[in-house]
């Protein structure tokens, strides 16, 4: 994966940038979630509010191709040891540029440099399955290519 990402990084038309441009990011997030017939956990206003309420805890990495936003990763700092990739989204019109891979690679580099001990790659589920918590094998495999290990979160419920 490392050699592959290096080749992508050498593309002069691709640029990664840490910024706070939620207005550019949110339409990409909406389109990605719509593919799965779901909506984002947070509205655009909520993301901006969270960023104001918790300064430095939300970190947005945007990916641009020829100046156009084609992807972004929003990371939430959980504590001094853990950062969570909460949303890793791409514009499906640019699959050959592999923005998701670039974004994760840069997030790993950033998290390591910032001294985090753990990088949580987030959930890997199939929201359209009969059980929406069904693991997505292809998404898990994608994440494992970066050296991550999967863990199953078990949900328990009690009916009153």
PLM regions: where:
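Flexible, glycine- and charge-enriched loops at secondary-structure boundaries
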Residues: 40, 97, 101, 136
């Amino acid at each position: 994966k490392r050699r592959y990402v290096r080749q992508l990084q050498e593309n002069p038309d691709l640029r990664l940038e840490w910024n706070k441009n939620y207005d550019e990011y949110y339409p990409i997030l909406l389109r990605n979630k719509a593919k799965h017939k779901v909506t984002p956990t947070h509205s655009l206003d909520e993301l901006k509010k969270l960023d104001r309420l918790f300064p430095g805890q939300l970190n947005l990495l945007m990916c641009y191709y020829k100046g156009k936003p084609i992807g972004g990763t929003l990371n939430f700092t959980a504590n001094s040891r853990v950062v969570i990739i909460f949303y890793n989204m791409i514009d499906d019109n640019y699959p050959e540029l592999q923005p998701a891979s670039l974004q994760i690679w840069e997030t790993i580099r950033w998290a390591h440099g910032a001294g985090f001990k753990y990088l949580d790659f987030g959930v890997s589920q199939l929201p359209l399955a009969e059980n929406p918590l069904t693991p997505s094998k292809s998404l898990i495999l994608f994440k494992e290519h970066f050296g991550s290990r999967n863990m199953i979160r078990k949900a328990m419920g009690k009916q009153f």
